[in-house]
Amino acid sequence: MPFWYSNSKLIWLLSPFSLLFWLISQLRHALFCLGIKSSYRAPKPVIIVGNLSVGGNGKTPVVVWLVEELKKRGLRVGVISRGYGSKSKTYPLFVTENTRPIEGGDEPVLIAKRTNAPVVISPNRQQAIELLLSQAECDIIVSDDGLQHYKLQRDLEIVVMDAERALGNGFVLPAGPLRELPSRLKSVDFVITNGGKNQYSDAVMYLVPHFAINLKTNEKRQLKEFQSGVAIAGIGNPQRFFTMLEKLGIQLERTQAFQDHQHFEASQLEKLAENQPLFMTEKDAVKCQSFANDNWWYVPVDAEIIEAEKQCENLPHFWDKIDKLVAQYRNG
């Protein structure tokens, strides 16, 4: 919501509801901390990758980056997710790159495609982990989202934040974009800011595009080969994608933002594209591949994550924590 990032009077009208939201969430958290509500401890270490605020912060590229980095270190990695956008009739569901996005959810299918890691979705994270471990050998589990899912105990927490929007007006829902107060950041292990550095950054992520891939033929082209086109995005922050294309020198004749996890139909996009190249995110492409036209292209991005400050040791310390965690679980 635009007013989350301004001084709109709506903030004060909605603030009583935010107070109620905060009280309920604090009570719920306290019940888990006191052991009054039960939580699940997985037999393998769990890393949560989540957000403090709603809206596109760049969480999925961080999950992909983290899984790939863990695999480079010789670890067998499994991924669990709630599976937002999934309309599967049964859960938990084992997701592969060939799972239909309407069943597996666009982000889990994308993660499975990019990492080849085993992925299981379920609103019940315990059931997701149990199915995952029954079908795959894992040394460590990455939870895509779930920072506020206190029914699942965790060993490490990573928060991904948009560097520019940060925490918005600082209010929790519905007056602001936050699911928890900013003070929650003091208890997480690592904060990655997307697109630049701010006061909360332990590390900075830049999303780097290298080429465009045709949805129908899988042909790869350098982005500099395109002069103009049309762009669509069904992600949390569509403008970030449009701005990226324009910075690469592509003149966008038209842009269309859709809601996050939008399920597309061919007719929607054919009208937009006409005879021009149509650009979309990789997350949207997994939902459009089955009915793509010849002039539809997606732009995959890779997360490049660097220290927030020169001479900083946050990343080495982070990997040290993971090594110790895995060793601890292996040794019982």
From Swiss-Prot:
EC number: 2.7.1.130
Pathway in which this enzyme or protein is active: Glycolipid biosynthesis; lipid IV(A) biosynthesis; lipid IV(A) from (3R)-3-hydroxytetradecanoyl-[acyl-carrier-protein] and UDP-N-acetyl-alpha-D-glucosamine: step 6/6
Biological process annotations from GO: lipid A biosynthetic process; lipopolysaccharide core region biosynthetic process
Residues binding ATP, per UniProt: 53-60
Family of the protein in this entry: Belongs to the LpxK family.
Annotated function: Transfers the gamma-phosphate of ATP to the 4'-position of a tetraacyldisaccharide 1-phosphate intermediate (termed DS-1-P) to form tetraacyldisaccharide 1,4'-bis-phosphate (lipid IVA).
Name the UniProt record assigns to this protein: Tetraacyldisaccharide 4'-kinase
Organism: Haemophilus influenzae (strain 86-028NP)
